[in-house]
């Protein structure tokens, strides 16, 4: 089922028993985090806090707190269907030339559908029903969460940041956390390799000293939100991909104060600029690592205008030691990643990002090994193929007789098929998440690959062990006798 906007999604969740309305007053300061954390760990519903303490704007939390709700937001009925979305993205990322006329005709509907999902620009939009400008702009009127006791200030977490570089027609959508530092100012924490930061850098080079236009959409429809965190091919905009997920074109509207286009059905829009050179220290904040991050300097976004729907809903989350929403998103999007990786590396059987690994810091790959050194080729490919894995610190590669999602299997493979010196790949001075304080330099650290595959001639001079396999006939006989033995 597809959802036109966030409210449509809320109705759909409520009909399925996947959303709970909370009418007891709950404070955005620490209390919502506690309630959402307990609910997420219990695999509970999305939560709509209808009476946040001190505010008259409801807060939506734990929206993507289960993989099933992530799948629903992407228009799928189950997490298994996410593989089909991954196959579509794999095809669009690396389209193969048709093998003949019949093959060309079979692929034509896919390309026609992609072309037909170009965003639609509208003149009037519900996200601009109410306009607040100038001195009336006051972010303290929004129920922005203060998530952890050691957090320095309230933090906008689910803001969909819209930017455009000076040499680009396509807009970039990214989700970057934003520390509130004044009634109309937030700190835009985007890492240097992210699309928004790249657009800003190019703008400063081409238009030195001129303000950089930015818009932030809060409470967009689920397909647009999830499109911003999915590995969309560079040839496809996030808005067009959201249209594919939703089954109809994404409606956009031009901002009141700049030329950026934002989701027309979003709940709240922040419009403004970043003045080149205006920076501020950001943090500390509790993050998805389970620790407070160190303070670092990032650009300041000045909010010049807030537009919103009548009676808007504020969409929020928290991040902490897994499980949290980013970890759950990682579990669901894992199913999207598998076909994309298999398109490039057909020998990959499965790929798994354990949620305990903070969404992306560890990956387990199972493969059909075909030659000496093959496992090392695959681990290097994982690091380099998708930018989502540039911060993955540990890649474990093992054979296809191992279940990548079963630690008992994986640990058995590591401890029986690896020689630590021969089968460990260490790479130094590589990009690392700035939130990773374990790295010796902020943003720069090492990576480790573990080759836990059976070794081929050329990789070892020893006779390799044979896996113990039970006798099938004996197993069948004992199955037949089992009830008579009285053991269970």
Swiss-Prot record:
Q: Which organism is it from?
A: Pseudomonas entomophila (strain L48)
- BP GO annotations: ubiquinone biosynthetic process
Q: In which pathway does it act?
A: Cofactor biosynthesis; ubiquinone biosynthesis
Task: Specify whether Ribosomal protein is a keyword of the entry.
Answer: no
Chain ranges passing through the membrane: none
Catalytic residue positions: 287 (proton donor)
User: What membrane topology is annotated for this entry?
Assistant: Peripheral membrane protein
Top EC class, one word? lyase
Where on this chain does Mn(2+) bind?
172, 238
Cofactor(s) it depends on: prenylated FMN; Mn(2+)
Does the record bear Flavoprotein in its keywords?
yes
From the Swiss-Prot or TrEMBL record, state where the protein is found: Cell membrane
Gene Ontology cellular-component terms for this entry are: cytosol; plasma membrane
Positions that bind prenylated FMN? 175-177, 189-191, 194-195
User: Sorted alphabetically, which keywords does the UniProt record give?
Assistant: Cell membrane, Decarboxylase, Flavoprotein, FMN, Lyase, Manganese, Membrane, Metal-binding, Ubiquinone biosynthesis
Gene from which the chain derives:
ubiD
Q: How is the cofactor bound?
A: Binds 1 prenylated FMN per subunit.
Entry similarity comment: Belongs to the UbiD family.
Identification of the protein by name:
3-octaprenyl-4-hydroxybenzoate carboxy-lyase
Q: Which Gene3D superfamilies match?
A: Single helix bin (1.20.5.570), UbiD C-terminal domain-like (3.40.1670.10)
Q: What is its EC number?
A: 4.1.1.98
Q: Which reaction does it catalyse?
A: a 4-hydroxy-3-(all-trans-polyprenyl)benzoate + H(+) = a 2-(all-trans-polyprenyl)phenol + CO2
Q: How does it assemble?
A: Homohexamer.
Picking any one GO molecular function of the record gives:
metal ion binding
Among InterPro entries, the record links this protein to:
UbiD, UbiD-like_C, UbiD-like_N, UbiD_bacteria, UbiD_Rift_dom
């Amino acid at each position: 089922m597809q959802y036109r906007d966030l409210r449509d999604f809320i109705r759909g969740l409520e009909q399925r028993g996947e959303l709970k309305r909370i009418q007891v007053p709950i404070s955005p300061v620490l209390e919502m985090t506690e309630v959402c954390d307990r609910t997420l760990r219990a695999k509970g519903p999305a939560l709509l806090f209808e009476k946040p303490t001190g505010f008259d704007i409801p807060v939506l939390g734990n929206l993507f707190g289960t993989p099933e709700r992530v799948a629903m937001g992407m228009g799928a009925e189950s997490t298994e269907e996410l593989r089909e979305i991954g196959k579509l993205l794999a095809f669009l990322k690396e389209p193969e030339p048709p093998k003949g006329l019949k093959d060309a005709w079979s692929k034509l509907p896919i390309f026609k559908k992609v072309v037909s999902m170009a965003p639609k620009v509208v003149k009037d939009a519900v996200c601009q029903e109410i306009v607040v400008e100038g001195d009336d702009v006051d972010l303290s009127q929004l129920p922005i969460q203060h998530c952890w006791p050691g957090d320095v200030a309230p933090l906008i977490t689910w803001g969909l940041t819209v930017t455009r570089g000076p040499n680009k027609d396509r807009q970039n959508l990214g989700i970057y956390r934003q520390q509130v530092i004044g009634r109309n100012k937030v700190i835009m924490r985007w890492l240097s390799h992210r699309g928004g930061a790249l657009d800003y850098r190019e703008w400063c080079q081409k238009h030195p000293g001129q303000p950089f236009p930015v818009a932030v959409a809060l409470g967009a429809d689920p397909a647009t939100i999830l499109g911003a965190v999915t590995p969309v091919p560079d040839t496809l905009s996030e808005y067009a991909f959201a249209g594919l997920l939703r089954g109809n074109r994404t409606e956009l509207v031009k901002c009141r104060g700049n030329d950026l286009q934002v989701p027309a059905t979003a709940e709240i829009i922040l419009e403004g600029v970043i003045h080149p050179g205006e920076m501020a220290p950001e943090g500390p904040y509790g993050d998805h690592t389970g620790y407070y991050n160190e303070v670092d300097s990032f650009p300041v976004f000045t909010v010049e205008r807030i537009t919103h729907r009548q009676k808007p809903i504020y969409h929020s989350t928290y991040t902490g030691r897994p499980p949290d929403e980013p970890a759950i998103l990682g579990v669901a999007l894992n199913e999207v990643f598998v076909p994309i990786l298999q398109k490039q590396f057909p020998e990959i059987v499965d790929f798994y990002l354990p949620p305990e690994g903070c969404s992306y810091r560890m990956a387990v790959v199972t493969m059909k090994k075909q030659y000496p050194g093959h496992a090392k080729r695959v681990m290097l490919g994982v690091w380099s193929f998708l930018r989502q894995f540039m911060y993955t610190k540990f890649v474990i590669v093992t054979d296809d007789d191992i279940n990548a999602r079963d630690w008992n299997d994986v640990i058995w493979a590591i401890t029986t098929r690896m020689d630590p010196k021969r089968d460990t790949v260490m790479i130094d001075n590589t990009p690392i998440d700035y939130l990773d304080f374990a790295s010796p330099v902020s943003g720069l650290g090492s990576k480790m690959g573990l080759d836990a595959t059976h070794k081929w001639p050329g990789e070892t001079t020893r006779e390799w062990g044979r896996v113990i396999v039970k006798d099938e006939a004996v197993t069948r006989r004992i199955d037949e006798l089992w009830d008579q033995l009285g053991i269970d």
